[in-house]
Amino acid sequence: MVCSITKLAQKLISIPSISPKDLGCQDIMIDFLDNLGFEIKKININDTKNFWATRGFGKTLTFAGHTDVVPPGDYKYWNDDPFNPVIKNGLLFGRGSSDMKGALASMLIASERFIKKNPNYEGRLSFLITSDEESSAIDGTKKVIDYLISRKDTIDYCVIGEPCSSSKIGDVIKNGRRGSITANLTIHGIQGHIAYPHLADNPIHKGLPIILKILSIKLDDGNAFFAPTSVNISNIHAGDGINNIIPGSLFVQFNFRFSTETSEKEIKSKFTQILDNNNINYSLNWFFSGNPFITKKGLLIDNITKSIINLNKVKPVLSTDGGTSDGRFIASMNAEIVELGLMNNTIHKSNEYVRISDLEKLAIIYEDIMYRLLT
């Protein structure tokens, strides 16, 4: 017999909600929460669907997540249709099963169980759901947070269902994330025949020593929560593949993942200082993804840790590694934030799956967190 969590997860996975399209996932969630007595506010912007659901009053525990998924890629690498969820040997396969429709199903079932047992709980239980997490993240959680701040609304504790477990549910939880900023640098030269270099200005030759200087930038040593700030090249391009032309420009894209020891301003200053000291013609633009954030030990981490130890017999490791998450937007509300979800070993891969037993384990832990913070 397929349990209610699995059925709900299958229902969500069967919808091809490639970011930022929701295509009906949130309608399923909204109907579910409406039946539990939640007040729902839809905040839809352009192609993005968002909603904010609340039940109760007082200190607010929010469960946050996203209904969008990354594209499945070439179907030939899947054993089954990625949007036709199938169960094999206790595993539920499908795009979004781990990231993060399985966790959404666990959240919903956990809230249903909690409310049935504790209909008059103290405080407020809420959901913040978006369909724009995997792509631009422009019209998603950020806009919902802007709306909540404009209304002077609050979030005290937030559990984000991102898949950060490694080998056992809850063995790794995220209590922060690094900041991210991208530099798009174009070094301009003069195109010419490669046999007459004195009549051209090769931007690759000019750019190579500058690239090495940028890669050697040391911004900080990190701290107890974060590794040192890092810089990596993500894209580089010059020329059109012709072997007798000196290209007219060199494009290099750098990404910085930065700790709380360094600011966006400091990164930009060090970067442009290197460029300006080398007398080159360049153009530069930046894309800022978000600042780092950290939740230090407090009520949320303490209670989540106790839940995981008691219910899954493992002590969680606190981590801030990995990519950015929507926690960077929620952090602006001064909330305590922890990311706790399913396994991350198959996310964004073909044949993504989740163990059905893990859906139930996660729901039990989520329900216990509700009990600890709202009763």
UniProtKB/Swiss-Prot annotation:
Gene3D superfamilies: Zn peptidases (3.40.630.10). Keywords: Amino-acid biosynthesis, Cobalt, Diaminopimelate biosynthesis, Hydrolase, Lysine biosynthesis, Metal-binding, Zinc. The active site is at D68, E133 (proton acceptor). One of its GO terms (biological process) is lysine biosynthetic process via diaminopimelate. It catalyses: N-succinyl-(2S,6S)-2,6-diaminopimelate + H2O = (2S,6S)-2,6-diaminopimelate + succinate. Zn(2+) 2 binds at D99, E134, H348. Its EC number is 3.5.1.18. Catalyzes the hydrolysis of N-succinyl-L,L-diaminopimelic acid (SDAP), forming succinate and LL-2,6-diaminopimelate (DAP), an intermediate involved in the bacterial biosynthesis of lysine and meso-diaminopimelic acid, an essential component of bacterial cell walls. NCBIfam families: dapE_proteo, PRK13009.1. Belongs to the peptidase M20A family. DapE subfamily. This is Succinyl-diaminopimelate desuccinylase.
